[in-house]
C-alpha cells in the first residue's frame, strides 16, 4: 500500500512554491500607456539610474529601410531619455505593446520623471525636459 508523504516532507516544497509565487506577484506593473487606437504604446524604464521612455507603433504607412548594423527589427520602436539625449528610432527584438496598459485619451497628458506625452487623434507626441522627442502616427514619425 502506498503512503502519502508526511506533512514535514511537503513543507520545503510548499515553502519554495509560496516564495516563487510571492516573488512573481511582486513584479511591478508596467508604467506607461497606449493610444485609444491601440496602435501606439509607451512604457517607462529605469536603467542604470536613468529614466527612458520607449514607444512602439504597430501600423505605419511606410517602414524605413533597416540599417546594416541592425540584426533585429527596425522602424517601429522609439526611445528618449529624461534628459540630455536626442530621441531615436531603435533596433529592437521585443515590444512594449501591452493590452493591459491604460489608455491615454485624446487630449490627455501623461507625465512621469521629466517625460511628457500627449495624445490626440493625429497620434502621440512625447518629449523630455530638454524638449527632444518624437511624434508618432500611422502616416509619419518625426524626431525632434
Regions found by a protein language model. Give the residues of each.
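Bacterial N-terminal signal peptides
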Residues: 12-21
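Acidic, glycine-rich flexible loop segments
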Residues: 93-127
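Extracellular glycan-recognition/adhesion modules and their associated mucin-like linkers
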Residues: 28-39, 106-112, 116
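Sec/Tat signal peptide C-region and signal peptidase I cleavage site
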Residues: 22-27
Amino acid at each position: 500500500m502506498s503512503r502519502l508523504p508526511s506533512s514535514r516532507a511537503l513543507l520545503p516544497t510548499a515553502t519554495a512554491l509560496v516564495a516563487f509565487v510571492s516573488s512573481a506577484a511582486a513584479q511591478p506593473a508596467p508604467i506607461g500607456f497606449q493610444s485609444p487606437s491601440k496602435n501606439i504604446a509607451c512604457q517607462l524604464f529605469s536603467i542604470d539610474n536613468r529614466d527612458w521612455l520607449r514607444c512602439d507603433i504597430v501600423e505605419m504607412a511606410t517602414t524605413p529601410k533597416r540599417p546594416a548594423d541592425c540584426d533585429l527589427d527596425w522602424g517601429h520602436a522609439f526611445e528618449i531619455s529624461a534628459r540630455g539625449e536626442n530621441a531615436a528610432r531603435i533596433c529592437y527584438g521585443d515590444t512594449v505593446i501591452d493590452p493591459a496598459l491604460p489608455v491615454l485619451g485624446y487630449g490627455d497628458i501623461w507625465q512621469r520623471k521629466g517625460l511628457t506625452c500627449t495624445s490626440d487623434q493625429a497620434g502621440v507626441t512625447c518629449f523630455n525636459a530638454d524638449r527632444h522627442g518624437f511624434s508618432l502616427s500611422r502616416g509619419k514619425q518625426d524626431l525632434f
